[in-house]
Amino acid sequence: MLWLLRHGEAADGSPDSERPLTEEGERQARLAGEALKRLGVEIAACLTSPKVRAAETARLTCEALGVEPQQEPKLAGGPFDAEALAAGLGDNVLLVGHDPDFSMAVHAMTGAQVRLQKGGIAAVDTGELSVLLRTTEIEAIAQ
């Protein structure tokens, strides 16, 4: 299954690539990791955008999952082939990045029109949208 996590809330400022997470964004990232762990999701690999807010989200999320995130420049912005990036990395691969790119990737794989909120998670399995979690659901699962 392919899991897509949009980065948590980020601070304003520029340059865009260096915007860090806010305290709320850090909380969202930790909760995402705890929620995936409680759901029994065993992430085999994590690929993240190199932009600071996404890399921080991946690091904090993966602490709970026991996985070391790897930076993937193709997730830094613009269209990408999520399935090609995840190919050969294991059964459950977590991608961490940005919108509208992630919502467009979900649409490309499933035909579903979604809008991932900051800190939100979508999971796609063989062309089907299997999971779509907003931060409120993630928080409830993680607690």
Language-model features: locations:
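Active-site-proximal alpha-helix that buttresses catalytic centers in soluble enzyme cores
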Residues: 1-79, 87-88, 102, 112-120, ...
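Domain-level recognition of soluble alpha/beta enzyme cores
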Residues: 110-143
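A glycine-rich beta-strand to alpha-helix segment
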Residues: 91-108
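Short, surface-exposed amphipathic charged segments that create phosphate/polyanion-binding patches used
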Residues: 84-90, 128-131
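Short, charged, surface-exposed secondary-structure boundary motifs
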Residues: 79-83, 124-127
